[in-house]
């Protein structure tokens, strides 16, 4: 059996499940790091290079991984919270034979700045996105309901909008062909309602609506999704299942109904690129392939470095057979804004 980074991530995840205290946390961090290695550990070892060149790998862990590369043992099905994830290395390899997915992408529609829990300024995020050749990005800092992420209230959202307008003027004067869209990641309750005054959303270009509470529910949550899709303030449903690598498997729902409802409502379902989310998964994307629903790609980047997560969503969509025409990030800016304007956010 060939040992991949995904396999190593699972083996480390199992060690975390079995350990306690700081060892549990250390193995958990290592498992997450393995997902994001840009090259297969087996390829590094085959060149007789040190496995310590891989992020998060020290001498002890390098010896353990080397042992697994020699004898991984029997393959075991991952638990639900680690099932259906893919490694960054596999995404890069796949896109290497489908370069048009990178070349035709026009923008990234979910990211965060220092206006909420991001680590970089609006300008830093914009300049980094321009360097990637994007036509546009949407800044989607958290709304006020998510206190842990320093979510914005209506006054802060207005101030951010003024800063975005000034930034766009500055970028244009510097010859950068990038448009920063005014957006927000709005907290949705169990009924699908948002936490912001609708009037404060009217100047925005895009609203991503996301669930951030009651995420460990074991009940069927179809009703919650249908409420969100019926919310006229929402353009994009963010990280739809709310799954997190090694933490929770995601919400349960009738996904056939949800894809159909999204198609009728004209709401895009996000393919969240964060390696710990990868949400929607390839399996769900395949389920929604023929539904007529639209999709949106967002890295959920909280730093300029995390903009590279986009590869995971691109490869997932390509692997699932999603037509690029149904992914709004491949649209020209005028078409994107026309679509967004067709949905009332008031």
Label each residue range with its predicted role.
Residues 1, 39, 52, 74-105, ...:
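Charged catalytic cores and adjacent phosphate/nucleic-acid-binding surfaces used
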Residues 1-98:
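Long, highly charged, low-complexity intrinsically disordered interaction regions
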Residues 10, 25-28, 32, 63, ...:
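Solvent-exposed alpha-helical segments within well-ordered globular domains of core cellular machineries
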Residues 109-115, 136-140:
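Ser/Thr-glycine-rich phosphate-binding loops at phosphate-binding pockets of nucleotides
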Residues 186-187:
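Short glycine-enriched loops at secondary-structure junctions
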